[in-house]
């Protein structure tokens, strides 16, 4: 397996063990490791990364830190960098060159880093196994009158807050459109205000369903 031959299809690789981490970094002299956590910060951070992967050749290994703890610990030990999630590290010849984590994974931070990463000959896309069907089901139930405004808001915000999927930036932005950043509401869900205060909720939900496809 070589970086030149397989860069197009080997974009996103699960790293479940320390051995897989070592093999991945050996196979790909220039590569990134993304540690995925258990909340929407992971979804947001990966969405930012995904926008750069569309235009740049950078294989990414991802670690779900709760499920694959030995792999995560191995990365922390080999780099000497304190673990965070989400966390993005870029390696060259097995040595970490760059690290950023949590809400600091932003376009402004990544842009100068990716200026040093080879560009793709054509725009690419990152395929993941995550889907948006749970959101679709909840939204359909709301539009069909099976769920009240308040219950829908409660369930949707909870689902979004706990969503650690590796999503595209487009999906993240669409899903966050209804109620914004749930981190603003840790003092209690009542701080969200009335479900209808951003406009007719059912109309906005139906529009979102249409855009999600």
Regions found by a protein language model. Name each.
Residues 1-29:
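N-terminal leader/targeting and pre-domain segments
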Residues 84, 89-123:
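Non-catalytic, surface beta->alpha helical segment in thiol-disulfide oxidoreductase systems
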């Amino acid at each position: 397996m070589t970086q030149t031959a397989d860069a197009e299809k080997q974009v996103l690789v699960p790293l479940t063990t320390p051995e897989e981490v070592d093999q991945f970094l050996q196979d790909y002299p220039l590569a990134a490791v993304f540690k995925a956590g258990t909340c929407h910060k992971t979804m947001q951070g990966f969405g930012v990364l995904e926008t750069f992967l569309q235009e740049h050749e950078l294989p990414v290994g991802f670690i779900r830190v709760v499920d694959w703890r030995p792999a995560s610990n191995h990365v922390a030990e080999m780099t000497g960098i304190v673990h965070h999630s989400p966390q993005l590290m870029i390696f060259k010849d097995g040595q970490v060159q760059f690290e950023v984590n949590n809400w600091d994974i932003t376009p402004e931070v990544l842009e100068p880093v990716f200026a040093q990463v080879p560009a793709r000959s054509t725009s690419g896309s990152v395929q993941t196994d995550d889907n948006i069907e749970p959101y679709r089901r909840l939204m359909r139930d709301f539009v069909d009158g099976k769920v009240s405004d308040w219950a829908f808001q409660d369930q949707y915000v909870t689902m979004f807050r706990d969503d650690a999927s590796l999503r595209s930036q487009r999906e993240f932005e669409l899903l966050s459109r209804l109620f914004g950043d749930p981190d603003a509401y840790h003092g209690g869900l009542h701080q969200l205000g009335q479900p209808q205060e951003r406009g007719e909720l059912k109309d906005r939900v139906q529009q979102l369903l249409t855009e999600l496809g």
